[in-house]
Amino acid sequence: MKKNTSIKQTVTIAINTAIYVILSCFASIPIGPNVVLETSFSFLVFVAVLFGSKVGLSVGLLGHIIKDFFLFGNVYFNWIVCSGLLGFLFGLSKNLINLKYHSFTRKKILFFWLYQVFVNVLVFGLIAPISDVWIYAQPLKLVFLQGFLVVLSNILSYSLFGIFLMSKYSNNYGKKEVLASNNCVYYKKPPLF
């Protein structure tokens, strides 16, 4: 049983990493100097909330590495770590939001929105700019301005695309998993953790 789960998780990571890379390369909207509206981050957040922190971390790390190689020819490890951290932190909210078994209610949307503001400020407003200054000796004002623009663009992206993806998934697949047996209907209980 453990082997089957790890195979499913590996396939999930591979497929979602490919989608993340495609969105990063072809569906990013430039909004400022070195700042783009990343639809791929909205997808990463959706995947992390749906499948958990391990998948979110893996998709964030692998997807960003492949994207950097395709677009720039080299990698910026501090931003790669930030993408992985973003996926990990959003994956921690999997059991609270619980898209697989429950509706994506207004209360959950509000929680997600506040949580994404906190995570964005932490990861792209503090960790990424400080690591740019520390590793690449970038000017302090420039990196914090870029960090601020990235935080705003991510909040906009998650508010538009992330909430839309989660709402559509929840409406189509998340209400109840019904098992029919002998003309009786049983509802699968959600896992506690």
Curated annotation (Swiss-Prot):
Q: What is this protein called?
A: UPF0397 protein PA0141
Q: How does it sit in the membrane?
A: Multi-pass membrane protein
The family assignment reads: Belongs to the UPF0397 family.
Q: Which organism is it from?
A: Phytoplasma australiense
Gene Ontology CC: plasma membrane
Query: Principal localization?
Result: membrane
What keywords is this UniProt entry annotated with? Answer: Cell membrane, Membrane, Transmembrane, Transmembrane helix
Which parts pass through the membrane? Answer: 11-31, 43-63, 69-89, 109-129, 147-167
The compartments listed are: Cell membrane
Output the superkingdom of the source species.
Bacteria
Determine if Membrane is one of this entry's keywords: yes
PANTHER family, A to Z: UPF0397 PROTEIN BC_2624-RELATED, UPF0397 PROTEIN SPR0429
